[in-house]
Every structure is written in C-alpha cells, then in structure tokens.
Amino acid sequence: MKLSTLSLPLIAIMLASCQPKEIPTVYDRENTADNYTAIEMPGLQQLPEIATLPDPFAWADGSGRSTRFDDWARHRSEIIQQLYHYEIGEKPVVSRDSIEAFMDNDTLRVTVHNGGETLNLSATIKYPEGDGPFPAMIGVGFPYGSLPPQIFESRNIAGIAFNFTQVMSHTQKRGTEPINRIYPDMIQIGAYSAWPWGVSRIIDGLEIVGEQSRIDLKHLGITGCSFAGKMALFSGALDERIALTIAQEPGGGGVDAWRVSETLGNVETLGRTNYSWFLESMAQFAEENVSRLPIDHHQVAALIAPRALLVLGNTDFEWLADESNYVSSRAAREVWRTFGIEERMGFSIEGNHGHCQLPESQYPEVEAFVDRFLLDKPEIDTNITRADMFSEVDYMKWMPWAEK
C-alpha cells in the first residue's frame, strides 16, 4: 500500500513517541519533588520492623512498588519527607524574592531575608584563566574540598568555597546559630538540613547574578570529606541543580546504612553519632530499634539519582564503617541500574592513606567522573565499583527487593 505524503509527518511523530525518554543529568530546580501530597508519619511503635534495607521503590503507604523512572520523583518526595521527619528536620523553603546577591570581585555575596531578619553568606570563587563560563566544584571549606586542586585546575574548573559556619557551626548549640536568627521556630533541625540549605542559597545567588558569576550552572558539583562528605551527600541529595556529588569518606550518617553499621564493630552507629547534626529525636531508633526506621542511607544516596554520585571510602579508619558504605553503595546503585544509567553512580574504597587524603590510585576514578559529568565527555568510562577487600561480603542479603 502506497503511503501518502500527508501521512509521513504523522508516522515521524509516532516513531518519535516510541523512543526511550532521555533521562536528565541535572535539573534547573532545587527540588522537582516538592508538589506531592504529604504522607503519614507513624510513631516508633506503629512503624513495622524492617530487618533488611528498605525497598527504595516501595510506596510509603504499603500499596505496592514501582520501578518506573516516571514515578521516581514521587519516590524522592516520600523519602525526603521521611528523612526530614525522622532524621534531620525540614530544610527551610525560601522564596526567590527574599534573596539578594551580587559579585564583589571574586566573592559571591548572598543575603537571605525572613521575618525581618537577615543572614549573610559569602563564597570565594577560584577562577581559571579566561572568560568562562566555567564548570565549578563547590567545596566544603575550600574551593575543591579535600580533593587535590590540580585535578580541577588542570581542567579549567572553578572552585567555590562554601563557608558552612556562616549557617551553623560544626557542633551547633541549638538556638544560637546564624540560621536560627532567621528561622527561630526551626531550632530543632540538624546541621544536615541547615548546611544543605546554605549550599542551595549559594546556588540561588549564582543564578541571580547570572553571567556576572562566569559559572556554568548546568555543570555544578559538590564535594567534602568526613563530616563534610556527609554535607556534600545531603546537599546533592536535596538540590537537583547539582550535577555531580563526590562524597569522600563520609562514614556513619553519610552513605553508610544504619542497619548494616549496627552489625559491625567500633563504628559510628545511629546511637553513637553526633546529634548536633541530626534531630535529637532520631535517637529513639538506636540499637535494636534501628529496624523500625522506615528509610536507610542507601535511599539518601539514591536521592541523587538520576544525577551523578561518586562515593570514596578508606578502610584504614574502622569508625568509617566502610563495609556498611560498600553494602549501602551497592543497594543505592541498584536504583541507577534499574533506570539503565548505572554508570552515573560509582564507588571506590581503598586503604593505606590518610583520612581525607586522596591516594594517587583514586585520581583516575575522580577524574573520570569529573570529565564525564562536569566536562560533558560521555565517552569516559565511569562504571566504577571498586572495593576488593569486600568481595566476599554478601550484600544481596540486605536487599531482597533487588533484581537477581
């Protein structure tokens, strides 16, 4: 049968609709999951015991599960709500008209207004030679965090130093922190809600000043190590404008799964963490009650999906519980794998080096993620899952929901 020319455009449209949807690597909104209905938050005794790692694809109300990417935003909404309620407290929501920003030479200055009070933030930017715009790495404390600067400087990547103390101190005293001045009714929140709020305000500032920043906002990364590695993880999890998160040696409360850590030795468990970083009420889930926590930190890591995440570990420090990091990273990566984008999540765990001192053997892995996700080089291989010392660990027993 001969096709008329009128039918050809229709056929083209039909064929296009059959093509798989391209999964974004970054978004232009802080949180695309902010418009879903609030879910119920049962008390401790009403929560079911879940001995293994909770299914990241299961609905919170027990009505089933979905592994469709189109449903992932709703899953993110539910996980974030549970994370806020049971672990870190709500990250304050800010309207754009309450923020002012300007460039002061190579320093971005941001002012946030709320309730008649103001909070001032500043971020020094280390620029490469040239006019830009440049991809950029937000580093906790330093322009590139604890990662070697030459990895970024040799690639003409800017570094943005995030001064977290302008938001909240390392061991907060509730009610006396800078953020408490503009949110006096939210003094219960943990630092891992407050610090990511500050990172998001720096990104807001970059958006407000626009081309003056000389920063490519489609290619922003964040990194930090140890407690700052957790900070980077939570920041990447809670702001979808961050294209690449590198969590270096984050330890307990970071990528490590609380449930797995509870089975190990002298490590940072839920009952032995720093509660200035979390809600004080999270302590109710310590020890034998950890199985009642409705989420775990493989889901916190998975909040970064479908964007890029690289997790770095260091087995020389028992407290970091890198076996837990390994199991949780495996479980989190299952989310990326389910969506057919497992190359966007990797992990590398290695010993024989100082804390927060990246060994040369891990340079290529960091460079690969930087090249692919900050410099747009899709040909770079980022299928990195290196933790040879844990090759005999039965991680699958922790994730019965995963595809065998």
How would you name each of these model-derived features?
Residues 211, 248-300, 321-329, 335-342:
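Mobile cap/lid helix-loop segments that gate and shape the active-site cleft of serine hydrolases
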Residues 14-17:
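C-terminal motif of bacterial Sec signal peptides marking the signal peptidase cleavage site
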Residues 19-21:
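Bacterial signal peptide processing site
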Residues 139-214, 218, 251-260:
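Cap/lid segment of the alpha/beta-hydrolase catalytic domain
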Residues 132-137, 154-159, 217-219, 240-244, ...:
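Loop/turn elements at helix/coil->beta-strand transitions in domains of secreted/extracellular proteins
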Residues 1-8:
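Bacterial N-terminal signal peptides that target proteins for export
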Residues 23-122, 127-132, 305-309, 314-404:
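Alpha/beta-hydrolase-fold serine-hydrolase catalytic core, especially in secreted/extracellular enzymes
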Residues 202-266, 278, 289:
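Primarily recognizes the serine-hydrolase "nucleophile elbow" in alpha/beta-hydrolase
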